UniProtKB/Swiss-Prot annotation:
This is one of the proteins that binds to the 5S RNA in the ribosome where it forms part of the central protuberance. This is Large ribosomal subunit protein bL25. One of its GO terms (cellular component) is cytosolic large ribosomal subunit. Belongs to the bacterial ribosomal protein bL25 family. CTC subfamily.
Amino acid sequence: MDRKELQVKERTVTRKSEVKKLRTNNEIPAVLYGKNIESKKLSIEKRELLDALSTAAGDNVLLDLKLDNGESYPAIFKEIQKDPIKGFFIHIDFHTIDLKETLQVSVPLNIEGEPVGVENGGIPQYQLREIEIECLPTQIPDHIEVDVSNIDLNESINVGDLPLPEGSELVTEPEETVMSVVAPETEEEPDTEEDEEGEEDVEEESEEEEEESEE
């Protein structure tokens, strides 16, 4: 489990123009909330944020928030808001945690291997890229390995088949499919008998018309 110390500052600015100025100065507005504390408006330097997100755990990294007033809180990223087009950070939500209490987190799946069913002409279909588990904050895994190399044609691997880290419990329904290998769709061949019957009917009608015209 990766753990990072993060320096943050309490902020008093709340108006849009002031918050926008923060971002111009490479500071990201944030908020900290959780059990038994009053929510705190914060700001964090962009480089500090990028450093915290640079570990293998990504946004599942365990944080030690260090406020400029000397206070310290264990926390996690609750929400990271980014501009959908330009990708810059808009706002960060931090949530304080108790290191002795379990919490529910989404953990990415690391898909490994080439399904044997693909070699046999199948098509792989991936339904899930992450699952939700419950564990202690200090036991949050960076990811969960999923070996799909033994999945054959018309077979699948479900959430309940995955190896969970010690001390964690599954939150996602075990019956949910992670990936499967399906047979390719085949095009239906036209009904040749009906086509032949149709051609015969046309020929008969043509012959009748010729006979009538001769009369």
